[in-house]
Amino acid sequence: METFLFTSESVNEGHPDKLCDQISDAVLDACLAQDPDSKVACETCSKTNMVMVFGEITTKANVDYEKIVRDTCRAIGFVSDDVGLDADNCKVLVNIEQQSPDIAQGVHGHFTKRPEEIGAGDQGHMFGYATDETPEYMPLSHVLATKLGARLTEVRKNGTCPWLRPDGKTQVTVEYYNENGAMVPVRVHTVLISTQHDETVTNDEIAADLKEHVIKPVIPEKYLDEKTIFHLNPSGRFVIGGPHGDAGLTGRKIIIDTYGGWGAHGGGAFSGKDPTKVDRSGAYIVRQAAKSIVANGLARRCLVQVSYAIGVPEPLSVFVDSYGTGQIPDKEILNIVKENFDFRPGMITINLDLKRGGNGRFLKTAGYGHFGRDDPDFTWEIVKPLKWEKPQS
């Protein structure tokens, strides 16, 4: 059996780039909660003792940007300079302007267009991916890397590993077998965790705690063997972290947000964007399409692409690739996709209920992945029943 290795990485919520994603989406939530028609393009950057939010927002909502920044930082665990940022005492800079009137007239006609007439907020192409290798219809390498990061945060916040600090990264290499285009995980080849820690703990204690409290509960035993390699804080020291260690910026973790390097990516980030931005809404609808194809048994693995022109409602193209795993030809799968999914931005917004913010709905997406999550707020994860006839063998 010929196998190959594939690696996916993740970062947890205290990573400076992810901090910025979460602040941008917390701003989006706050705007949509009061004004579902808010037009939001909110970026965040951070460095030592400073967070800045900037971008274009047109909203009737009354939003306290500084409070959102401080609350988000505090919830993650950035409560002192020692851990990388002090939520209550850091500088918060705000530079928010209205959406460009040129964009507004072209996309939504200054709020006058009906949903089916709303154009794409920009050009671009987005990809959705699904695979039958996990119950989430997501790649195992990505699922494990993401869950390790989430578990790191869990054991930090519940006191199991009190020496942990907010920043951290994970990476998992999986050995795979290609079964006629479908991906079959064989074993976990390598587990890498680099986590921020306080001064009190030794490297041996870090490694022991990570194996016992993070790796064991996350990675199924069947994937681990005596040959599995563990790199646990391989650099030896990671005390300085968060924005103190590295500058953070919204939209720099787009592969972590999606499929861990599997499938393809059009390059557009998600966080801080309202649903007229097809970088986000387009990527969500093609995930639903790809997942529905696999969950309905049409294929074991699937990639769906959609593309747009600014101001134009209808997509320019839709593409399907089943990697040779389709029960019927890809051309027929494409027809089923077009019959069952409306790719116009205004209709995606309605069908996936994307104007509903608040209660941390989009904030949740900004940590630990936008896809493969079992949460009713992740409406794009709902599998649509697709009618098709299996060919007679």
Swiss-Prot record:
Pfam families linked to this entry = S-AdoMet_synt_C (PF02773), S-AdoMet_synt_M (PF02772), S-AdoMet_synt_N (PF00438)
Residues binding Mg(2+) are E9
- Enzyme class, top EC level, equals transferase
**Residues that bind K(+):** E43
Q: Which GO terms describe its molecular function?
A: ATP binding; metal ion binding; methionine adenosyltransferase activity
Sites binding ATP sit at H15, D167, G168, K169, S235, G236, R237, F238, D246, R252, K253, A269, K273, K277
Question: Does the keyword Magnesium feature in the UniProt annotation?
Answer: yes
* Major subcellular site: cytoplasm
Residue runs in coiled coils = none
Q: Name one GO biological process term.
A: one-carbon metabolic process
Cofactor remark from the record: Binds 2 divalent ions per subunit. The metal ions interact primarily with the substrate. Can utilize magnesium, manganese or cobalt (in vitro). Binds 1 potassium ion per subunit. The potassium ion interacts primarily with the substrate.
Cross-referenced InterPro entries, in alphabetical order? ADOMET_SYNTHASE_CS, S-AdoMet_synt_C, S-AdoMet_synt_central, S-AdoMet_synt_N, S-AdoMet_synthetase, S-AdoMet_synthetase_sfam
Per the record, GO CC terms?
Answer: cytoplasm
Q: Which cofactor does it need?
A: Mn(2+); Mg(2+); Co(2+); K(+)
- Top-level taxon in the UniProt lineage: Eukaryota
> Is the keyword Protease in the record?
no
Q: In which pathway does it act?
A: Amino-acid biosynthesis; S-adenosyl-L-methionine biosynthesis; S-adenosyl-L-methionine from L-methionine: step 1/1
Task: Kindly state which reaction or reactions the protein catalyses.
Answer: L-methionine + ATP + H2O = S-adenosyl-L-methionine + phosphate + diphosphate
Query: Quaternary arrangement and interactors, per the entry?
Result: Homotetramer.
What exactly does this protein do?
Catalyzes the formation of S-adenosylmethionine from methionine and ATP. The reaction comprises two steps that are both catalyzed by the same enzyme: formation of S-adenosylmethionine (AdoMet) and triphosphate, and subsequent hydrolysis of the triphosphate.
Q: What is this protein called?
A: S-adenosylmethionine synthase 1
Q: Which organism is it from?
A: Elaeagnus umbellata (Autumn olive)
